[in-house]
From Swiss-Prot:
Database matches in NCBIfam families: DapF
Classification via PANTHER family: DIAMINOPIMELATE EPIMERASE (PTHR31689:SF0), DIAMINOPIMELATE EPIMERASE, CHLOROPLASTIC (PTHR31689)
Classification of source organism: Bacteria, Bacillati, Bacillota, Bacilli, Bacillales
Name this protein carries in UniProt: Diaminopimelate epimerase
PROSITE patterns in the cross-refs: DAP_EPIMERASE
Membership in a protein family: Belongs to the diaminopimelate epimerase family.
Function (record text): Catalyzes the stereoinversion of LL-2,6-diaminopimelate (L,L-DAP) to meso-diaminopimelate (meso-DAP), a precursor of L-lysine and an essential component of the bacterial peptidoglycan.
Complexes and interactors: Homodimer.
Main location: cytoplasm
Functional pathway: Amino-acid biosynthesis; L-lysine biosynthesis via DAP pathway; DL-2,6-diaminopimelate from LL-2,6-diaminopimelate: step 1/1
UniProt gene name: dapF
Organism: Bacillus thuringiensis (strain Al Hakam)
């Protein structure tokens, strides 16, 4: 029997099991199965996945994110805010502004601290990637993939593709509560045009500075929030002429609100909360 200490945290209801790999050890070959086990709500702790906070050669910390199906993702906006909170409060970093390595690249975090506790985290997510090769999608072309039609159940849905280090298909609807989240979501997630699968977002524009948001996450299904998805939604809204670049947009997710801005300089900034749920020790056994 093996075990490790963990902290369960969430960003707007998007919860992960966080493991401090400065102190804990999980064999590389076990990570996918451990992520699947620990995320199980009936036989594990229950979460949208597992995130490792690791040493890095190029930043103070490195984030590795595993979905609850065991697949490894390249980035996670809500996870990054929680990693920023954990790293500062556990003295893995000293400054309130620091970098975090991810499989999608290095991002910059800035934390707001009150009485020694992080109350808010802002992440510079970098520039969105908009070509087919960057997303990635099958096909050729260097122009952004904007409002292309997808036929499902005799209905045409127009989506815009954006990568924020992980791929997103953003669909505009009149009412997110009536969107085909659990039906079209998994169909588009696993469509052959996305070789690495895709996160699917449904967006309802409320006005020039607000939107409602629902998400089907790659490898996790319906979740309360998706930080990179909120960033992709704002980028897609601007590409479609629905919102203005440089303004801070309020994204209303099922779990709460995020503030997103696609700056004139090119980067996307995400600001929102990160909270601790509990700490504990998880025991597991890998069958031979």
């Amino acid at each position: 029997m093996s075990q490790f200490s963990f902290t369960k945290m969430h960003g707007l209801g998007n919860s992960y099991i966080y493991v401090n790999m400065f102190e804990e050890q999980i064999p590389e070959e076990d990570l996918a199965l451990v992520a699947e086990k620990v995320s199980n709500i009936n036989t594990g702790i229950g979460a949208d996945g597992m995130i490792l906070i690791c040493p890095s050669d190029v930043a103070p910390v490195k984030m590795r994110m595993f979905n609850n199906d065991g697949s490894e993702g390249k980035s996670c906006g809500n996870g990054l805010r929680c990693v920023a909170k954990y790293a500062y409060e556990h003295k893995l970093v000293e400054d309130t502004v620091f970098t975090i390595e991810t499989l999608a690249g290095i991002v910059t975090a800035e934390v707001t601290v009150e009485e020694g506790k992080v109350t808010l985290a802002k992440i510079d997510m970098g520039a969105p990637r908009l070509t087919r090769a960057e997303i990635p999608m099958l096909g050729e072309g260097e122009t952004p993939f904007i409002r292309e039609n997808f036929l499902y159940n005799n209905h045409r849905y127009a989506f815009t593709a954006v990568s924020m280090g992980n791929s997103h298909a953003v669909i505009f609807v009149d009412d997110v509560e009536q969107a085909p989240l659990t039906t079209l979501g998994p169909v588009l997630e696993t469509h052959e045009m996305f070789p690495e699968r895709v996160n699917v977002e449904f967006i309802e524009i409320l006005n020039e500075e607000e939107m409602n948001f629902r998400v089907w996450e790659r490898g996790s299904g319906v979740t309360q929030a998706c930080g990179t998805g909120a960033c992709a939604a704002v980028v897609a809204s601007i590409l479609n002429g629905k919102m203005e670049r440089g303004k801070e947009i309020t994204v209303h997710l099922a779990g709460g609100d995020l503030m997103i801005a696609w700056t004139e300089e090119g980067n996307v900034l995400m600001k929102g909360p990160a909270e601790v749920i509990c700490h504990g020790v998880y025991e597991y056994k890998i069958e031979a």
